[in-house]
Amino acid sequence: MTQKERRIFLIEYLLRENPNYHGVQIPDDEDEQKILLRSLMNVRPPQHTSKEFLRIQDNYLQEAIRQHGITGLADLKPVTGRGNGDWYVWRGDITTLKVDAIVNAANSGMTGCWQPCHACIDNCIHTFAGVQLRTVCAGIMQEQGHEEPTGTAKITPAFNLPCKYVLHTVGPIISGQLTDRDCTLLANSYTSCLNLAAENGVKSIAFCCISTGVFRFPAQKAAEIAVATVEDWKAKNNSAMKIVFNVFSEKDEALYNKLMS
């Protein structure tokens, strides 16, 4: 099957399984088809999926990521003068990064972003991992029986992403003036991810900028906490785990490079 044939199959499957979509027309434009498919995946509840759907979805997503370009750890340049070549700052799409684990800035529901085509990292990771990720996360949350507390972490397979695992953590939401508790909770998110990564044999991990987006944690302070917390954890655990700070903007890239220079 071509990518177009896969995309049409997936859209038709998702439209058929929900009677509310009766009458929805599939657009001819490729970009509009991609938007429709992503939207349908983003709002789809965790439920049974046919083996045929999963096979075609997996082929489609893996090819889409391959076309976008996969970045491996060997493609990154270590930060000079820090550690033993095990610290990196990288600006790019975390869903294309081939490391052992990537970190997802999740919400307390832990089942991904339900807003169609939202640009948050939670949405991107769930979209390109595939519908299996929401199903697995929903199972974890059902067994847990309550929302995910701030500063903790869960680990799942990465499914169609180039990495092996996704670590999901809920960072603090800033609604007013930044407090010491906010800073402690953010540090806890980093520590929880590192502990869980080590328990699962992870040798390389990529952190997004936890809490700095819609959760409104100030970027400068968040970066300081991130670097200090990871550095402290590596020292206490005598760890050679490779650390990638994945950033979105040139400003954040400069900020992390300055902190680690």
Swiss-Prot record:
Domain named Macro is located at 74-261
Q: Which Pfam families match?
A: Macro
Q: Which InterPro entries match?
A: Macro_dom, Macro_dom-like
| Listed cofactors | Zn(2+)
Q: Record's superkingdom?
A: Bacteria
* Keyword Zinc among record annotations: yes
Query: Which reaction is recorded as catalysed by this protein?
Result: 4-O-(ADP-D-ribosyl)-L-aspartyl-[protein] + H2O = L-aspartyl-[protein] + ADP-D-ribose + H(+)
Q: What UniProt keywords apply to this chain's record, in alphabetical order? A: Glycosidase, Hydrolase, Metal-binding, Zinc
- According to the UniProt entry, the coiled-coil residues are none
Keyword field contains Metal-binding:
yes
- Annotated ADP-D-ribose binding lies at 93-94, 107, 120-122, 211-213, 215
Protein role? ADP-ribosylhydrolase that specifically reverses the SirTM-mediated mono-ADP-ribosylation at an asparatate residue of GcvH-L, by releasing ADP-ribose from the target protein. May play a role in the regulation of the response to host-induced oxidative stress.
Q: Which PANTHER family match?
A: GANGLIOSIDE INDUCED DIFFERENTIATION ASSOCIATED PROTEIN 2-RELATED, MACRO DOMAIN-CONTAINING PROTEIN
Family of this protein = Belongs to the MacroD-type family. Zn-Macro subfamily.
Record's protein name: Protein-ADP-ribose hydrolase
Question: What's the source species for this entry?
Answer: Treponema medium
